[in-house]
């Protein structure tokens, strides 16, 4: 007999919606905030990868409600961004309508999976009542001096008519559409995330996050200590600075390299080299930073025709340009020490430049990067690395040509996009050159509706074409001004959405401070590892700014974070439309049911593992739920006669073991092993002639967070008059986890005569009396004298007789 998942799931989804079952409670003394990374509502709808993380947070939310917590478990939509705009450009449709339609699909799919979201808290980043506060936060950043305009060399994609982030450029072409990308300087809004670099680094220590993820953030921030050194250009009134972590190797600096974009390149390039330098700069502009720093690629470069002077030994150092030096890192210039740096060594070999060892221990076949005594280094000779660095910095500072410095790989956050479908930046530039933010009482600054959202082509956003939006007049002074036409990146709305869920309808502030105190930090945040750096770093940055403003009272937004693994196609390949291996959850819900999909995805393996989808595995998950239903319900839908009010001793131990194991495993997100234990319980249930009703009620509660529909149905059949949602979580009895009886071996002269079940911890004399009373033993010792009886508690009795 199989249960009818379609009827049961529709029935309970309607019940939950009609009864507002998952409306966030506020009346208990414990709070738990379980958050999903909210989705971008694409045209494709949900795929089976989405529900994995959503099911995990849903299990924890349902589990915590039963444990007596107020649970905040919301859902919303990260709905601005490139794909909707690209669709609108391709089809001529309005991105707002497209987005609305996609959200409706996502919401239907999510509701059909039985997730216990409080839909009264639903948010949408494109809702003016939401982005009013995204704009408000931008204004606070501006007031604090953390938002500024700069000319930045950016990834410009002429075909898309926009600037792309480094992550959106792959091998010199746009990730979307494969269009060529070049580097060109443009006026951009930038946020000063670097001001928070040390705090972003230090506060990672306090977080319960995977260590691998913390390391990714540490590497992205990339803090390094060293020195900044000034180099004079020979015969020209110019100098440039380099940052180095190894100022002690300065005597081994035999050439210098500037990035092709360095501001000094034009001024120091000789006439003979001008053509080669210009051609090289154009070539470098077509590469992404990632390609340029690829260690495996051959080094390229061009001599500028000028020389720098080594400030320690006075030697001439040819100045080259090469794309392995980035304008955005350090000072955009390096002193090259080929004897002790792998990249510098390869470059020197390629172009026949001098290699001068200044640390003992190497040979001339490769760069020596180990420690050793300094040589060929004047007064640094004989010192080791640490001493050498310290002394070199003292000498630099004494000569006035350098100083101790901390550098970061982290760059300020390029915040503007030359697109239409994003939050307008609330800034006006006036004809006298001054700049002001839009008065806060006038927020939200609405995104104007327009038919023409093709990029302007000039690098400005399509908003630049809408005169009634762009042109403003100050009502007091009559001065004319222009609104900012860049929009915010998609990251903006997702930087703070977890705060808005706490108080989503507040029109006076982001959220009530008392509610923020009550719910923050987020107790559990689950999402994909692809957001390990950017989203999480940006959200942490904004949170720290809001902390400094007194808006929030915690230093960090997300206390515990977990990355679910990826669900791959059946052949262990990533699911993609082009491979035709995408599994649509709608199909699975129709054929097997939402409970089966949830159970299967949690049973595939550990939550953080990447595992291939298997139709057999899905069938197995359904068979288990059928077995649960068959054990408890008769063909006619009534409760099985096996279920009794009487105690059933044979099931005591496995029941209490199951409560303990499932509770412990849910706490650690070990859902696959929790399910295994529930399978053990059901197997034992089939062997038992009777089932105690309290055991069954407890079991149904344990299964509920994973399979909520079937368990609501079973709960009703067990006499429940309300939803199982707020029933108390089962507790186990420690004393019932151990057996009250044990099986022992009975031997005569070392030969097995019988196995017998006795009370656990029976004392030796009782064991002897028991063994001697057995018929098999009496037969074996008939006519013999018992010489000795050896009893080993809980194990065996051996009777020696002859």
UniProtKB/Swiss-Prot annotation:
Major subcellular location class: cytoplasm
The UniProt record lists the keyword NAD: no
Coiled coil residues, start to end: none
Domain of life from the UniProt record: Bacteria
Subcellular location: Cytoplasm
Motif residue range(s): 'HIGH' region: 39-50
PROSITE patterns tied to this protein: AA_TRNA_LIGASE_I
Keywords carried by this UniProt record: Aminoacyl-tRNA synthetase, ATP-binding, Cytoplasm, Ligase, Nucleotide-binding, Protein biosynthesis
Enzyme class: ligase
GO MF annotation: an example: aminoacyl-tRNA deacylase activity
Binding site for ATP: 577
Reactions listed under catalytic activity: tRNA(Leu) + L-leucine + ATP = L-leucyl-tRNA(Leu) + AMP + diphosphate
Motif ('KMSKS' region): 574-578
SUPFAM superfamilies (alphabetical): Anticodon-binding domain of a subclass of class I aminoacyl-tRNA synthetases, Nucleotidylyl transferase, ValRS/IleRS/LeuRS editing domain
InterPro entries: aa-tRNA-synth_I_CS, aa-tRNA-synth_Ia, Leu-tRNA-ligase, Leu_tRNA-synth_edit, M/V/L/I-tRNA-synth_anticd-bd, Methionyl/Leucyl_tRNA_Synth, Rossmann-like_a/b/a_fold, tRNAsynth_Ia_anticodon-bd
BP terms from Gene Ontology: leucyl-tRNA aminoacylation
EC numbers for this chain: 6.1.1.4
Cellular component per GO, a single term: cytosol
Short name of any one Pfam family annotated for the protein: tRNA-synt_1
HAMAP family hit by this protein: Leu_tRNA_synth_B
Family: Belongs to the class-I aminoacyl-tRNA synthetase family.
Family annotation (NCBIfam families): leuS_bact
Protein name: Leucine--tRNA ligase
Gene transcribed to yield this protein: leuS
């Amino acid at each position: 007999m199989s249960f009818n998942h379609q009827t049961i799931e529709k029935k309970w989804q309607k019940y939950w919606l009609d009864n507002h079952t998952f409306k966030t409670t506020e009346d208990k003394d414990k709070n738990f905030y379980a958050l999903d990374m909210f989705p971008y509502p694409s045209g494709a709808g949900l795929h089976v990868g989405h529900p994995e993380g959503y099911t995990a947070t849903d299990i924890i939310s349902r589990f915590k409600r039963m444990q007596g917590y107020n649970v905040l478990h919301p859902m919303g939509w990260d709905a601005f961004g490139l794909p909707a705009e690209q669709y609108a450009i391709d089809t001529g449709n309005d991105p707002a309508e497209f987005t609305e339609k996609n959200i409706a699909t996502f919401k239907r799919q999510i509701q059909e999976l039985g997730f216990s979201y409080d839909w009264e808290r639903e948010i949408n980043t494109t809702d003016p009542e939401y982005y009013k506060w995204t704009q408000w936060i931008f204004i606070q950043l501006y007031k604090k001096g953390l938002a500024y305009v700069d000319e930045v060399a950016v990834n410009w994609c002429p075909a898309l008519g926009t600037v792309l982030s480094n992550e959106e450029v792959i091998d010199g072409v746009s990730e979307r559409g494969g269009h060529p990308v070049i580097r060109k300087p443009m006026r951009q809004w930038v946020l000063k995330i670097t001001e928070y670099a040390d705090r972003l680094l230090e506060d990672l220590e306090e977080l319960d996050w995977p260590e691998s993820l913390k390391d990714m953030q540490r590497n992205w921030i990339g803090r390094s200590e060293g020195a900044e050194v000034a180099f004079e250009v020979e015969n020209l009134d110019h100098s440039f600075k380099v940052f180095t972590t190894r100022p002690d190797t300065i005597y081994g600096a035999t050439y210098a390299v500037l990035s092709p974009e360095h501001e000094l390149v034009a001024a120091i390039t000789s006439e003979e080299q001008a053509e080669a330098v210009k051609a090289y700069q154009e070539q470098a502009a077509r590469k992404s930073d990632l390609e340029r720093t690829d260690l495996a690629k051959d080094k390229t470069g061009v001599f500028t025709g000028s020389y720098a002077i080594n400030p320690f030994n006075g030697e001439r150092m040819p100045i080259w340009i090469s794309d392995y030096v980035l304008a955005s890192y350090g000072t955009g210039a390096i002193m090259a020490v080929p004897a002790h740096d792998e990249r510098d060594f390869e470059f020197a070999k390629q172009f026949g430049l001098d290699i001068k060892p200044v640390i003992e221990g190497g040979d001339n076949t490769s760069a020596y990067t180990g420690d050793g005594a300094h040589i060929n280094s004047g007064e640094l000779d004989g010192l080791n690395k640490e001493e050498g660095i310290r002394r070199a910095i003292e000498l630099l500072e004494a000569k006035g040509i350098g100083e101790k410095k901390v550098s970061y790989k982290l760059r300020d956050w390029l915040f503007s996009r030359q697109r239409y479908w994003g939050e307008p930046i609330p800034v006006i530039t006036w004809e006298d050159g001054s700049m002001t933010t839009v008065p806060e009482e006038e927020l939200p600054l609405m995104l104007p509706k327009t038919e023409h959202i093709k990029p302007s082509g000039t690098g400005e956003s399509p908003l630049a074409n809408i005169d009634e939006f762009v042109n403003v007049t100050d009502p007091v002074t009559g001065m004319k001004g222009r609104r900012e036409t860049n929009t915010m990146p998609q990251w903006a709305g997702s930087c703070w959405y977890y705060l808005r869920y706490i108080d989503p309808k507040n029109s006076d502030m982001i959220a009530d401070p008392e509610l923020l105190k009550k719910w923050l930090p987020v107790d559990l945040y689950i999402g994909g590892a692809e957001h390990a750096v950017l989203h999480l770093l940006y959200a942490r940055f904004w949170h720290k700014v809001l902390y400094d403003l007194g808006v929030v009272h915690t230093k960090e937004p997300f206390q515990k974070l977990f990355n679910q693994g990826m669900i791959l196609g059946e052949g262990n390949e990533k699911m993609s439309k082009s491979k035709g291996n995408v599994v649509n959850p709608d199909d699975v819900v129709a054929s097997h049911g939402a409970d089966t999909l949830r159970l299967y995805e949690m049973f595939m393996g550990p939550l953080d593992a990447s595992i291939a989808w298997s139709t057999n595995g899905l069938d197995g998950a359904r068979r288990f739920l059928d077995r649960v239903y068959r054990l408890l319900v008769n063909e006619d839908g009534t409760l099985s006669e096996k279920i009794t009010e009487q105690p059933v001793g044979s099931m005591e131990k496995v029941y209490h073991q199951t409560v303990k194991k499932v509770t412990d495993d849910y706490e650690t997100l070990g859902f696959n092993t929790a399910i295994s234990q529930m399978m053990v319980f059901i197997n034992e249930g089939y062997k038992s002639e009777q089932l105690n009703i309290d055991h069954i009620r407890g079991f149904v509660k344990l299964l509920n967070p994973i399979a909520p529909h079937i368990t609501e149905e079973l709960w009703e059949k067990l006499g429940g008059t309300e939803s199982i949602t707020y029933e108390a979580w089962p507790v186990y009895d420690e004393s019932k986890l151990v057996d009250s009886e044990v099986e022992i071996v009975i031997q005569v002269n070392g030969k097995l005569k019988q196995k017998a079940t006795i009370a656990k911890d029976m004392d030796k004399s009782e064991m002897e009396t028991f063994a001697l009373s057995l018929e098999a033993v009496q037969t074996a010792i008939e006519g013999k004298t018992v010489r000795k009886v050896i009893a080993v508690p809980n194990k065996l009795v051996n009777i020696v007789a002859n």
